[in-house]
């Protein structure tokens, strides 16, 4: 199987797991939580987690809860980012806050964030590893927020240096990819090497 097919296959697995994870009923918040995340996406970040697990000899299925958690956090940040940027479209569809309003979208994002931790706690790994994974995951979310804060400041500046821009992107975009790769490798019993 070539890499493109493997990525597609893993993305399909993630999509099915996301549907299961988001199968709540009864409140409008649940529809808001599902709107963007089940509306499509490449699933690059969770696929990286799964591939990293396999690359060090781990089993694909072992990393699925973590991969789902990574995608939940990614989408939680997108919900909040769309509100801040006043974006009306994402992935060719109306943004969540346009459909459900800003207050409900904020709490939907918060709920996706909480659900990510519920997914991580499904992992069958040693407590010491879980502690390291949870610490890195929490630091990742904080650094994403720091990157978003920098992004907000940059909107009112016309003197943003390349170094500042790369630092912002490193916190917002690269950090979640780093966590996906590191977490997947850790779940697969990879070493620091």
Task: Give the role of each language-model region.
Residues 1-20:
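N-terminal amphipathic/basic leader segments beginning at the initiator methionine
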